[in-house]
Amino acid sequence: MPQPSPSTDAAHRLIVGGGDSELDSRLSKELDAYNFAAVGESNLEEFTVKVEDTDGQLVAGLSGWTWGTCAGIGMVWVREDSRKEGWGGRMLEATEQLARERGCRQLLVSSFTFQAPDFYRRHGYTEFARSEGLPIEDAADVHFVKAL
């Protein structure tokens, strides 16, 4: 159960807790409203790309967003027994095509060094930033961009 913080005052409570999907949804809504007002673009759209086997089981999936002239990939996963079969590349191609159709000129994605940075490089993505020591000492969070 979340506990009030010692910094509580008469009018407010600071509460530290675990994951909260309701709070996440509210924060997203509030930030979207602020961002849309700031830049004059409100065409943020989420998308997904997935691969299923003949039994309807998930083989691979990708989720992301488009907004204005930019697209971003949030998550990519390929089932272990289906890796090295080209599904990741096909999902990237489908994502890039969708982003172009929505008027995007660039696509952003991040990958930890123990995940798939070389995969993105092979598909034409360029590293533009790197944060060392994340999420562990011997790893890094690598940020990529691809011009569409």
Language-model segments: residues:
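Conserved active-site tyrosine of GNAT-family acetyltransferases
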Residues: 27, 120, 125
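Acetyl-CoA-dependent GNAT
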Residues: 12-74, 79, 114, 131-133, ...
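Basic/polar N-terminal segments that are highly enriched at the extreme N-terminus
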Residues: 1-12
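Conserved short alpha-helix immediately C-terminal to the canonical SAM/SAH-binding motif I
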Residues: 91, 115-116
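Conserved GNAT acetyl-CoA-binding A-motif
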Residues: 99-113
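Conserved acetyl-CoA pyrophosphate-binding loop and the N-cap/start of the following alpha-helix
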Residues: 82, 86-94
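Conserved catalytic-core motifs of GNAT/GCN5-like acyltransferases
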Residues: 108-110, 126-143
